[in-house]
Amino acid sequence: MISIILVMIGGGFGAIARSAITDYFNHKFTSKLPIATLIVNLVGSFLIGLTIGLSISTSWFPAFFVTGFLGGLTTFSTLAKELTLMMTPKFNINLFLNYSLLQFIIGFIACYIGYHI
């Protein structure tokens, strides 16, 4: 039961962090790519890899930080929405593919680097 509470608390903080980061980057930068989602997903992927690589496995930390906070910070559903919204009548296949590759391949590389630090 305690791990469920830790996931809920961590997830809440992660979602708040994502919202703040998204607001900041959406006001500071204009881009055809959704930069804020890219940043939170890449940072989250790196931190997940780092946490796993460091074998931080106290009884509470993975539930609170990895599943909760980083699960709330990163967002696959927003990525799916953004990719769907790119498929408009003015669909740009290069933009769509570049953003997809950045998210998935660079996200994996970020996790891998974090794991091996």
From Swiss-Prot:
GO terms for cellular component: plasma membrane. Keywords: Cell membrane, Ion channel, Ion transport, Membrane, Metal-binding, Sodium, Transmembrane, Transmembrane helix, Transport. Its main location: membrane. It catalyses: fluoride(in) = fluoride(out). Na(+) binds at G71, T74. The keyword Repeat does not apply. It is a multi-pass membrane protein. One of its GO terms (molecular function) is fluoride channel activity. The chain crosses the membrane at residues 1-21, 33-53, 60-80, 95-115. InterPro entries: FluC. Fluoride-specific ion channel. Important for reducing fluoride concentration in the cell, thus reducing its toxicity. Belongs to the fluoride channel Fluc/FEX (TC 1.A.43) family. This is Fluoride-specific ion channel FluC 2. It comes from Staphylococcus aureus (strain COL). The gene is fluC2.
